[in-house]
Swiss-Prot record:
It is found in: Cytoplasm. Substrate binds at R56, Y192, K198, R319. This is Phosphoenolpyruvate carboxykinase (ATP). It comes from Geobacillus kaustophilus (strain HTA426). Involved in the gluconeogenesis. Catalyzes the conversion of oxaloacetate (OAA) to phosphoenolpyruvate (PEP) through direct phosphoryl transfer between the nucleoside triphosphate and OAA.
Amino acid sequence: MGIANMTNKLDLLLQKPYVHHQLSVAELVEKVLQRNEGRLTHTGAVAVTTGKYTGRSPKDKYIVEEPSTKQTIDWGAVNQPMSPETFDKLYDKVLDYLMKKDELFVFKGFAGADPKYRLPIQVVNEFAWHNLFVHQLFIRPSAAELAAHEPQFTVICAPNFKADPKVDGTRSEAFIIISFERRTVLIGGTEYAGEMKKSIFSVMNYLLPEQGILPMHCSANVGQEGDVALFFGLSGTGKTTLSTDPNRRLIGDDEHGWSNRGIFNIEGGCYAKCINLSREKEPQIFDAIGFGAVLENVVLDDATRVPNYDDGTLTENTRAAYPLQAIKNIVDPSVAGHPSTIVFLTADAFGVLPPISKLTREQAMYHFLSGYTSKLAGTERGVTEPEATFSTCFGAPFLPRPAVEYAEMLGQKIAEHNVRVFLVNTGWTGGPYGVGSRMKLAYTRAMVQAAVEGELDNVETVQDPIFGLAIPSHVPGVPDDVLQPQNTWADKQAYEQKAKELAQKFRANFRKFAHIDPTIEKLGGPLV
């Protein structure tokens, strides 16, 4: 099936009388309830469940191997190739399936808040609640923008269409397939809404570097003087918590582009984790979950319809989707100048990385490529040994190009704009998990505040003997002895052993970057 035929078939589908275009939030909420797709919470949010897929399915994600992408994509476990023939057949089947539906829902909008670089997208949904989700998550067009809107990428999402691996060339019933030549994302077999969000992020991660823009998996905020800070970090390291600051306005919580004009949010909404959410801990997120927000896999009280955010029965990965405008303290539109500070967040359960350290450009590139954090492997089964995880550029699952391309762009931009970079450990202190304790949030906030406000620019530093990092000897609001990890351990020998163990894990992980400039590891990596 050629591209022209595909376009014709899609046009035919979208002209059907039962296809709803650009419904408002209120109309979509009505549809969700009429169609029995979800329930209304006491604040007017829509609560839905996603069946057996309560998170992304990275093993079911493919990119179509086409002449234009054959040489530019980093093929492998993250970016699995699929032939154009396999994709075309499956695309045809999904469209035939959607032709038979009673109702479909279409949203047109944008990815990218900077009008110069935004991507006009359209999303075709089988479910009304999915359409509500994309309405809240992507950038909503004005009436004038909608009239002139010509989609450059289409997401087709048919969760109840199940692939047959024997016939369809997939691994399972679920599939998330990106075709850059056909400018299409095809999703089926999974109801998890995050697939739509992250597939467009993957698309932007491929397209933006062609325009000299660095796409980033980070949160961003801006101070009263217009100073921009970026926060990189994997899940659970505190990106959302630390970038939500009453004294700074939020640009975005997850996906950004860095152009020669500055920073812009790729999205128009937030997709916040809400396990154990409380108004005391995260008032901005708690209060944003109002009318038209989407709650994914959150358990409700049957009578009062009040969400129980502490209930992880369905999944620990409970989520809330809401528009940025539901947060009071934001930059609107979500664009700002060049960053003056970058913070890499890691949750080190080995308890050996310093709570804050200043990075050189080479160290910044090294730690960006490493993308280190740790997770507590199987604590529920009594296994308490932490596991080191490395996710390149703090976003490996969403990077179609080789990691080095993103790291080199970051290195150039850090040098060009004289950006200060810090590594902040929000994990353990005084020993590894099980012995030490989690770093106090108040201390981490004080360190981040000092870093972002330039208070550490001229501070005296001590070099970490194992990781080579420059540790400030004093940070306002933080006891000095907390800053040096070895001082917090009772057993100094055990500290050294554990630190060397982690340093070796960094080295072993970095072997996969054998083809890059060796000075990055030489000047940026551990000393041992």
